[in-house]
Design a protein with these regions (language model features):
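Mid-domain alpha/beta scaffold segments of enzyme catalytic cores
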Residues: 1-253
Length: 253
């Protein structure tokens, strides 16, 4: 009953091995999350080829920094999302980044594209998978202008002030394998109630030198269970039900 709600499946070279590992530890579903223009079609292709994966399409703020043609290409990205609206389960990974991306000249375009992605999510009545590193205040301010079915803040490690604001708004928070060693991620787990927690690998991001894989979310579940002092079996059911609320389309497609 384990579900990885945030994984960049297009970046794996040995996708068959990833699937085998995932199945072996009870991973039932994985949301494959796009980041770049070039990843959009590959994500859809993977999800059409392997029933473990479900597509999420969107533009990551890092793409604005890397792809100098993004402003010209964004219309084609939007068209692709609309073309695949029946199969995508959320809009993501989208958001703002003022931590890793230091060039402030890119911030206005980040915000413009973030708003375009949120407009799409609102139009399609889809949840969003949010990146907010170093830009928590701006992300939260922007989200207030949109009527979205659900918001998942992925790998939150920012100020407690905005964590508490997100909790008050009813946002969900997906937890990565970094929970095993990261004080900010442990704090997120401590403060967020179990009925608003989700699991993610963010693979293939590395954790202590190991490539992140969906199979790792079993360890994430066990670590959360320790922190929350909840039996892992009970927590697994709770988080599964949380996932059904946030991403209902992966259970209907």
């Amino acid at each position: 009953m384990l579900i990885d709600v945030h994984c960049h499946a297009n970046l794996y070279l040995a996708i068959d091995q990833i699937i085998k590992e995932s199945r072996s530890v009870g991973i039932e579903k994985v949301i494959a999350v796009a980041m770049s223009v070039i990843s959009q079609e590959r994500i859809v292709e993977i999800c059409e080829s392997y029933d473990l994966f479900f597509p999420a399409l969107g533009i990551h703020p890092e793409e604005i920094n890397i792809n100098k043609e993004i402003e010209k290409e964004i219309d084609s990205v939007i068209e692709n999302i609309l073309r695949n609206k029946d199969i995508i389960c959320c809009i993501g990974e989208i958001g703002l980044d003022h931590h890793f991306i230091k060039d402030k000249e890119n911030y206005p375009l980040q915000l413009k594209i973030f708003k375009q992605m949120l407009t799409l999510a609102e139009k399609l009545n889809l949840p969003v998978n949010i990146h907010s590193k170093g830009a928590e205040q701006e992300v939260y301010q922007t989200l207030t202008s949109y009527n979205l079915p659900n918001v998942n803040i992925h790998w939150y490690s920012g100020p407690e002030k905005f964590l508490m604001e997100g909790i008050e708004r009813g946002y969900y928070f997906s937890i990565t394998p970094a929970v095993k060693y990261s004080p900010p991620v442990k704090k997120t787990v401590n403060l967020v109630e179990v009925d608003h927690l989700l699991l993610e690998s963010d693979g293939p991001v590395k954790y202590s030198g190991q490539i992140g894989r969906p199979s790792m979310i079993k360890e994430v579940l066990n670590e959360i269970a320790k922190i929350k002092n909840v039996p892992p079996e009970k927590l697994e059911v709770q988080i599964y039900n949380n996932t059904k609320k946030v991403f209902p389309k992966i259970f209907a497609i």
